[in-house]
Amino acid sequence: MKVPFSWLKEFVDIDVTAQELEEKLFSCGFEVEELIPLDAGISKVVVGKIVEMEKQEGTHLTKCVVDCGAYGHEIRISTGAANMKLGDCVPTALDGSTLPGGITIKARKMQGVESNGMLCSGAELGLNDDLFPGSEVYGLLILPEDSVPGTDIAPVVGLDDYIFDISITANRPDCQSVLGIAREVAAVLGKPLHMPAMDYKAVCEPDAPITVKVEAPELCPRYMAHYVRNIRMGESPRWMKRHLALCGLRSISNVVDITNHTLLEMGQPMHAFDLNKVAGRTIDVRRAHEGEKIVTLDEKEFTLNPNNLVICDAEKPVALAGIMGGANSGMDDNTTSLLFECATFARDSVRKTSRALGQNSDSSARYEKGVDRYSPQLGLARALHLIQQLDCGDITTLEYDLTDGRPLERKHIVATPAKICGVLGITVPDQTMIDILQRLEFTVDVQADGSWDVSAPLYREDVESFPDLAEEVIREYGYDHIVPTFLNTASVTNGGLNYDQKQQLKTKRLLAAQGFYEASTLAFYSNAELDMLHIPAEDEARKAIRILNPISENLSIMRTLLTPSMLNVIVDNLKKGNAEGRLFEMAPVYLAKELPINEHPHERQTLCIGAFGPEEDFFTVKGALEALAAGFGLTFDYQRETAAWLHPGISAAVYCNGKRLGVFGKLANEINAELEIAKEQKDSQNIYLGELDYEALMSCVEGELRYKPLSPYAPVKRDLALVCGEAVSCGEIEETIRKASPLVSEVKLFDIYRGANLGDGKKSMAFSLSLSDPKKEVSAEEVERVVKKILGNLKFKLGIEIR
């Protein structure tokens, strides 16, 4: 939120610099994201008085002699402007000066005549008419006659000011205004707060009755309105235009500016209805009817439903409550009577409507954080005072104040100094705490038993209990007073990673060593992602938890698989020209026992890996899994299984110690054909995906992997070419070979052959075996005995013959 330094000074007698105030605001919990000097980029620009003028023959230029006081009384400058006269004072950029945008002015010849600077327009100084009158005139900016030559230009045109861009946290909606920040400035400086004038006088009776009603008090706890007749549209005074301009708003007309000024100054959104356009002279705050439509002031049409709160006349909606008025009730040059409204709307209602319709405004931004029930009273009074001050309408006696029935009263918190200090962990003198709370407009009534009855200001709806009082005390007292200490009962532990974190880090390093990069995706997606993978309706992955108020339908459910997100990442890479890569993600998936959920879902840690590129194949992923298994001292078994999104002939399930960990394989052809990538990419790409239950994987790990010395004896190698049926998997053969003897230290498949000489439904698989014994050399007799046993087991269990 932007707050001008000069505007704050109207509320508080500030005796510190803007930079010092920035530090003080930060110390009491308000981050100034940027302190913006209005004269940023301007240097050596002063007031110059034109003392001589002469038209430069044959050109459009005028040669001027300018009096710049101490900088020189006869500085010769040529200009192309024509709106000045002898004796005028104008902004003068001297030789070596700078202007906004990084422009540097140097002495140079113009049409053969030496010019020692530049005479400036308002635009060249970054000004507009709202900041300084005459700034948008074509030509030079003419300064007041009493300007003193040689004076720095900034204070003359109002550029000696700063804008505080302050980040307002969600728990402090009362600070969404200049007044709100001024309250904090007054407290931190120990200065009195000068409230803006809010008195007004009704000068006439209404000319016709108006009906105002609230049908949804749960969404509109307070609705105030006041009728003003004989509206006189005109221009706003200079001070109001400047206030608006410093906050980034342009002046429109006196009445419109009053509503915007009240929003900025008091933090109270306002709207004014042209009663000549309000059917039946009726205002009704209610839920929208299904299918109702409204066109807002920015000429956008929306279709509404009962979740949207609207303000209606006798026939139709005329405003989206808390967001924006309707084009059918806005002010124009023919407006003669207005109903000014100030209200408190439920923040959730405004937020949901704003998100659902995609419609935001300065008003909705404030309502979403919260506007207290006291605010409409102050805002409306201030607006009516300004109407009277600017004489832009006649205030009638007709006013409305409709509430939900709750009394408007201060919150009372009973606390003791010991409780407050107990929260802070330090001792703050009682009187110091009382002084701080009183500066923040709390009242403190000290009871006979030593307790305090503290009442919070009406605008501080965030204050609930004594810890909130402790926060108020410490942010004014100073966080630097808190001394770090250990609790008496606390134990000191060394920092570092716990066991689970170490195992996760090890997993990531093992995969990184295989050329995989870590991906990080959102925990939400939509049913479209599950549809993309052809997940059947009865699959457990379809039992996804739906978000009550999703940011968008694309992020409407909590993920039950990581694979959809991984495939999206791969597709994004392909679209952007990255033709190959290896990725992994380790993150939780959210599994509900039943829907709708009545207990916290299981957040299962899951590992997903993906590889894509023309050279990638099934063994890329299998090799990464083998490296992972070896890193944890495990052995993976593989069985022929598939999933809805995998190619049925190029996929497998991973098992360890009899536990099913997950599946991996090539992306199914039909899914690959549906991907939104170029056809040539679909034809040349190989996409492989795998998803493992990481918790099940870690349950197979038995403590730390211990070093096993290599056998000092050379292993004996044997190759076996085996003929088997097409249905027999490599994993089944490997498992049978390994179980035949402890001397088998390594089994590797190195060839697969299919041919007519083998017979129908047959294939040949060639394996390389390593046999070793850590205690001695393996004899030829032992090798023959082991090989014989292996062949016997293969024939008995799998019907396999030696080729």
Question: Model regions: which residues?
Answer:
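A carboxyl-terminal module marker
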Residues: 2, 20, 27, 439-442, ...
